[in-house]
Structure formats: C-alpha cells, structure tokens
C-alpha cells in the first residue's frame, strides 16, 4: 500500500469514527426526546396537568422526527413519532374503540402544506379538499347502536380510552337517540368536547371564590369537567361538542367527508357549520389565513385548521401510518400559550397613579411576537395566581391582547423561587402608596408632581386611542417634561418652535412633525379629548356615550352625576369619577389651558338636538375600503348613532366589509338583521336609516 493509500484509508477511518460518534450523540438525544415526550403526553392526556405548552411539545416532536429521518434505524414502533399520544387513567373503566382513533400530522407553513398536499395528490389529483376549524378541546368517541348512545370514551392511546358515558350523557348537544327514518345499525363518531371561551372566565372566577385552583385554559377545563366521578359536576359545566369524524359504521353509506357531515346533521349530531369544500390548494391556504385573522370570533378556542381529502375512496387509497391518516393534516397557527421563566416581578406607575405589578420574563415567542414582559394586573391577582419569582409560568397572548401570565407550573419548582413583596412607596416619587377602601388597586396619590404619572398622562393624551398626535411619543414626552418645556397635559398645545431650542435629538423635521400633529389634533372629535384627559374609568365607550349625548365638554363638566349616569355605557361609578375630576381646580385649569391652545371642546352640531342616526345601533365587521374601524365608528357616532361590538336583537344594521367575522355575519342572518355593504353604509351616513333600510335585505336563514 502506498503512502497516499495509507493516508486515504486513515482519513476514511477517521470519518467513519466521526460518523459513529455523531450517530451515538443523536441516538442519545433521540432516547432523551422520547422520554420527554412520553412524560409530557402522560401529564397532558392523563393528569390534565401539562408542564409545557403545545408549541414546545410540537417542537420536541419535530426534533425527534428530524433525527429519525436522518437515522431511520432509530425509528421504532414504540417511538412517540409512530404512535398516538396519550394513555388512559385508572380512575375510569378502560374500553377499546371499535376503530383506532388516530392523531393528525401537523404543518406550520405554506411550504410544508404544499409538500403534504403534493404527496396526497401524487397518485390521483385531489379535486375537493374539506377544511374545518381545529378545536382545542378533548377528543371523544361516541358509539350508537340502533340509534341509541351506548358508549362514550376519551381518545386514550387511540386503541383504548376511558369510559365516560354517564358524563357525556349530560351534554345537551349530544343526543341520546339519533333521529330520522334511516338510523344506522351501528355508528361510531369522533368529535371534540370544548368549553365555550365566554363561560371559561366565569368558571375560573367561581373556582377562585370557592378557594379552588382555577383551570389554566378552556381545554383543561373541558378535560377536567368530563373526568368527574360525579356526573352532576359535569352537568353543571357548559360543555359542548362538535363531531368531525367517523369510526366503525353499518348502514351509513356516503361517498365523502362533506356528505357524511350532512348526514350526521340529519341524524341530530352536532356538526360545525364552518367547514368548507374547496377546489385548490390556494383556496385552502386562503381559508387558513382568513380564520387565522378571525380565530377569536369563534365561540371556542381553535389552534389551526384541519384539511382533509373529501372523497372517501381517495381516503381509503391513501391509508394511514401507525399514528395518523395520510389524507388529513392539521395546519397549526402560531401558539398563543407558551411556558417561560419569570425572572422578576416589578411595578409600573400609570397615568392615574395606579401601581401595577408586571412580570419580567425570559424572552419567548408567542402569537408571532417576542414577549419579555407581561401584566399581573394587581397584588390580589398575584396572590390568586400563586406565582413566585423564579417560577416557570404559562404565558398567554391572544391576538392583540396584552400578554398575560396565566399560572405557575408548580410541578417544576425546585425551592429557589421567592414571593413578591409589593413596595410601600412610589418607586418614581417616593410618596407612600395607598389602597382606597373597596378597591383592588394600590395607588400613588401624588398627582401633581409624580414623574411617572405626568409622563404617562402626556403619552396617553398623544396616543392613537386618544388625540393621536403624530410625533409626540413616549421618549419625546419624557424629554419635554424633564427639561421643563411642559409641566402637564395642559401645556402640550402651547408648544411652539422655540419650545425645542437647545434640546438634543430634535431636528427641524422632527419639530415640524410634532407641530403638524398638534394642529391636526386640535380638531379631533370630543370623545377623543375626553379619553385623553385621563379621567379614571373613562375609556372609549363611556367617552363616546358622553360626547354623543352632551356634545360639549362644558356640558359634561357641569352636568350632575345623575344626568351623566343615565348615559348609555356610563353608570354611577364613571359619573362620580367625572364629577370628581372636574371639581378639582387643577383639572379645570388644565382644561382652560387646552382650550386656549386652540383645541375644539365641542362636536359639530352641539346643541342642535338629536343627530340623524339617533337611536340607530350599528355593528361593523370586516374591512371597509377607505375606512379604518375608528373612522367608521366616529362617522356613525358623530351623527348620533351607536356602534357596538356584538350582534343582538337591539342591532339596527350590520355593516359587512371584506372578510367579515363569521360569528357576527351568521348571527345577523339568524336574527334577520339588515346587512349593509360599503355602498349601503355610505347611504346610511348620507341619507339616514330609512334610506339604508330600503337597500338592505334581511338575510334568510337556510331551512
């Protein structure tokens, strides 16, 4: 053997050794991941006490799948990637499903979905995809014999679940007997039991009041409510169910998933009205995007969209792995709940003196953004939630909602955690904090010179929710106050070019932007000024009501509490706060300085009687071309109308733009409330309710 050959052989042996080492490392990591996933599945499915969020579980599963893809020899039949997650509790009788209840594979991006759809259509083109919302609840299997419900069971491990028949019988949406003339001899259906989101908050409040631990989320509430030894407890909870799949059946002959849903509905089973059959992959992705934007318009929590090949013949040909069908997939949305570490609890002093504790977190990505801080509301809330500094906590961020710490993961405590102690003095000005009788909030009473309150009130006045002063942000407000160029919100509209002389960071362009922003803000609607004054309890709803009814700041300032309380959306508490605010000479001086700065203190038409839309209640849903939600709302309110966020029998019109919220649109149809498109909305504003009503045709309810 030559020198070169010996060197090459040595290189090959070294490379082989490296590969063996790498394989050993990945083998160890795969075993570690398998153990972790088994433990998390047990806590989730059996104990209903998960210690990680769904997104973290999914990430661990995907890591194990990637290792097994690189090293197929590590993929064993008992790997978590090859079997249905879950098990069954020993508290209930185990029962075997007639047909296996499989899980679903997940995709998280358009590219991953395209790849899955291409595999599904490899042998035969798919001409119909059924799309439905993925409910975040508890999977349940129902068996009907001769039309009678004989058994209900949890998913368990997909083969064996827990017999929860007495508990499921208490659900109003689950029929004890199927209806209709052609009832199947045998019918096994699968569905999701869920806890309506609106009722979830009520349940947790009742549990806390009774001294019991609250549920972390609606899914846990549904699982905990179903796994009760006493069915009367289950019956007291507002559980609901939607059926979304078939198991074993005899005498139930249909050709497609959509056809099965229609037949199941005829039999009296609860089927979602929000599924759609679509022809193309792009249509499917549009459905996924649409419901991603409207996921909070649904009565239950959803964490994605399930996409199925609609044709049963194609489903049979595609078959399934040991874990999931090849003809269905779950397109998961970005997580809204994750776990992270609570590094510290600090306090923030707000514009009205309220001292609010907030959590400082290990930065974590949730709902599409990275979060490092989250509200804890007040000291009582810290106690109720039982969070300690150093805890691993469940963090929730739904859409545009402020991130919130939901609960601690108590099982992960190691003894190093410590309790939070509320400060006794304001961290900004040193004033002793007070807790007014009957209130949960602790406050700094120094409204005159507390730097935090002055800074926050100026920033709030300029914010988009108030006067929307372009260029006057938090940093600018801080500098202007610190340098003595303004002293409170009363000075803001007296800013002039010379006010910025000698200040670093204020170029001519920046100064011009602020002055233009002030000029535009001088003519904002009255309700925006009311919000900007930082009167306690006065938010947009109360401010709009006061502006609509009284039309000028002078009328509001001089009205007795009884008159203010009679305004829709106000009430005695807000009325008293308004009276108290205007009774303070310092506040009257602030208003006088705002007025002398050229700000309009009355809406157009003040004192002229009712507006043209007086008594008209409008709900706006979807996107209106040329209108933001705020400007559309102001257009209605400036004419005396009222805009609300939910449809009821009191609603006069529902204005539906592009991509309207399904729940509002459907409820309008059910209640036969006139629907207006953008053209109809323009007629409503220009010509009034009668003219708009003539254009709008009440939607008829099918059937």
Curated annotation (Swiss-Prot):
One of its GO terms (molecular function) is DNA ligase (NAD+) activity. It comes from the Bacteria. Zn(2+) binds at residues 426, 429, 444, 450. GO terms for cellular component: cytosol. Keywords: DNA damage, DNA repair, DNA replication, Ligase, Magnesium, Manganese, Metal-binding, NAD, Zinc. Residues 608-698 form the BRCT domain. NAD(+) binds at residues 54-58, 103-104, 132, 155, 192, 308, 332. Its cofactor is Mg(2+); Mn(2+). InterPro entries: BRCT_dom, BRCT_dom_sf, DisA/LigA_HHH, DNA_ligase, DNA_ligase_AS, DNA_ligase_CS, DNAligase_adenylation, DNAligase_N. GO terms for biological process: DNA repair; DNA replication. It holds the Pfam family Nlig-Ia. SMART domains: BRCT, HhH1, LIGANc. The active site is at 134 (n6-amp-lysine intermediate). It catalyses: NAD(+) + (deoxyribonucleotide)n-3'-hydroxyl + 5'-phospho-(deoxyribonucleotide)m = (deoxyribonucleotide)n+m + AMP + beta-nicotinamide D-nucleotide. Its EC number is 6.5.1.2. Belongs to the NAD-dependent DNA ligase family. LigA subfamily. DNA ligase that catalyzes the formation of phosphodiester linkages between 5'-phosphoryl and 3'-hydroxyl groups in double-stranded DNA using NAD as a coenzyme and as the energy source for the reaction. It is essential for DNA replication and repair of damaged DNA. This is DNA ligase. It comes from Parafrankia sp. (strain EAN1pec). The lineage of its organism: Bacteria, Bacillati, Actinomycetota, Actinomycetes, Frankiales.
């Amino acid at each position: 053997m030559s020198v070169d050959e010996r060197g090459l052989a040595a290189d090959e042996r070294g490379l082989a050794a490296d590969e063996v080492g790498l394989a050993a490392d990945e083998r160890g990591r795969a075993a570690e991941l398998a153990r972790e996933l088994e433990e998390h599945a047990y806590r989730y499915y059996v104990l209903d006490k998960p210690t990680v969020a769904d997104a973290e579980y999914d990430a661990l599963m995907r890591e194990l799948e990637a290792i097994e893809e690189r090293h197929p020899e590590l993929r064993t039949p008992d790997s978590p990637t090859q079997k249905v997650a879950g098990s069954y509790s020993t508290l209930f009788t185990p029962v075997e499903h007639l047909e296996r209840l499989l899980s679903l594979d997940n995709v998280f991006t358009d590219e991953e979905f395209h790849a899955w759809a291409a595999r599904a259509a490899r042998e035969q083109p798919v001409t119909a995809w059924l799309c439905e919302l993925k409910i975040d609840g508890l999977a349940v299997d129902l068996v009907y014999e001769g039309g009678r419900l004989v058994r209900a069971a949890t998913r368990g491990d997909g083969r064996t679940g827990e017999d929860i028949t007495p508990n499921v019988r208490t659900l109003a949406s689950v029929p004890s007997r199927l209806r209709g003339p052609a009832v199947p001899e045998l019918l096994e259906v699968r569905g999701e039991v869920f806890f309506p989101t609106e009722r979830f908050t009520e349940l947790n409040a009742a549990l806390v009041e009774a001294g019991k631990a609250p549920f972390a989320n609606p899914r846990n509430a549904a699982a905990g409510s179903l796994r009760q030894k006493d069915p009367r407890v289950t019956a007291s909870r507002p559980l609901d169910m939607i059926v979304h799949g078939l198991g074993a059946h005899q005498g139930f002959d249909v050709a497609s998933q959509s056809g099965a849903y229609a037949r199941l509905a005829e039999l009296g089973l609860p089927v979602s009205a929000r599924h759609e059959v679509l022809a193309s992959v792009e249509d499917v992705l549009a459905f996924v995007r649409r419901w991603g934007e409207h996921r909070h318009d649904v009565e239950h929590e959803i964490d994605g969209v399930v996409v199925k090949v609609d044709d049963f013949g194609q489903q049979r040909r595609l078959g399934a792995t040991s874990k999931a069908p090849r003809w269905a997939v779950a397109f998961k949305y970005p997580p809204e709940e994750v776990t992270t570490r609570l590094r510290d609890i600090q306090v923030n002093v707000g514009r009205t003196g309220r001292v609010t504790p907030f959590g400082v977190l290990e930065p974590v990505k949730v709902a599409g953004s990275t979060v490092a801080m989250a509200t804890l509301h007040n000291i009582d809330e810290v106690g109720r939630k039982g969070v300690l500094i150093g805890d691993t906590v469940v963090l929730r961020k739904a859409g545009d909602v402020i991130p919130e710490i939901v609960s601690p993961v108590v099982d992960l405590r190691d003894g190093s955690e410590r309790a939070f102690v509320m400060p006794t003095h304001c961290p900004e000005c040193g004033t002793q904090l007070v807790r007014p009788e009957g209130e949960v909030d602790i406050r700094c009473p120094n409204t005159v010179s507390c730097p935090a309150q002055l800074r926050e009130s100026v920033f709030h006045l300029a914010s988009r929710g108030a006067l929307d002063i372009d260029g006057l942000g938090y940093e600018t407000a801080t500098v202007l106050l610190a340098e003595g160029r303004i002293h409170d919100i009363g000075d803001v509209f007296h800013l002039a070019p010379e006010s910025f002389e000698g200040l670093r960071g204020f170029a001519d362009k920046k100064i011009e932007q602020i002055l233009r922003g002030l000029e535009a803000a001088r003519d904002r609607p009255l309700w925006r000024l009311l919000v900007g004054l930082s009167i306690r309890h006065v938010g947009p709803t109360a401010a709009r009501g006061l502006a609509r009814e009284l039309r000028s700041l002078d009328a509001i300032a001089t009205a007795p509490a009884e008159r203010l309380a009679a305004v829709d959306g106000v009430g005695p508490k807000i009325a008293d706060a308004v009276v108290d605010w205007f009774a303070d000479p310092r506040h009257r001086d602030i208003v006088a300085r705002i007025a002398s700065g050229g700000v309009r203190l009355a809406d157009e038409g003040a004192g002229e009687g009712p507006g043209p839309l007086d008594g008209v209640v409008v709900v706006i849903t979807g996107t209106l071309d040329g209108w933001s939600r705020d400007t559309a709302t102001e257009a209605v309110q400036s004419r005396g109308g009222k805009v609300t966020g939910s449809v009821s029998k009191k609603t006069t019109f529902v204005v539906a733009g592009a991509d309207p919220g399904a729940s509002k649109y459907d409820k309008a149809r059910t209640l036969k409330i006139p629907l207006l498109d953008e053209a109809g909305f323009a007629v409503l504003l220009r010509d009034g309710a009668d003219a708009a009503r003539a254009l709008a045709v009440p939607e008829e309810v099918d059937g």
